[in-house]
Amino acid sequence: FNAGAYHAGLEANKRKLAQELFIKDKVNIIVATIAFGMGIDKPDVRLVVHYTFPKTLEGYYQEIGRAGRDGLKSECVLFYTYADTRKHEFFINQIRDKKLRDTAQEKLDEVLSYCELTTCRKKYLLKYFGEDLKSDNCQSCDCCTAVRETFDSSEIAKKIMSAILRTDSHYGKNYIIEVLLG
């Protein structure tokens, strides 16, 4: 793959060149931070990947809005861990003004809620921005298109509880796992 990089640490001329190469299809992939041009209007972006947790839904929505501007199918992928949340919370806790700190925490909580959705993501985003999706199923987000498998885990839970009780709760999880596995 032909890829370029774009971040605030690059010299201005290198950033400009990376952006031009991407716009002119000389580079297929651009790996960028949020420093990447807000005004990028490339209609055929097919994939936007967030490798870390965004700070706000506003920022996330603006960034994913770069995908599929030509109306063709595109994908957005968001990877996150709870470590991302803790990192953002560390910086939020550095904010001295309580009102600003509370607002930043609320925005972070909204992003986390979005990440943990099991219902339509598009509906959630549109509602957040004061719009409405008439259907509960957009037929395009992962929550709406996922084939969900369920199973009754009550037997497994009973065996785990039985193993804990039979060992008088004196052992750690690794020992209990060994007992269960035989």
What are these regions (language model features)?
Residues 1-36, 40-182:
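C-terminal helicase lobe
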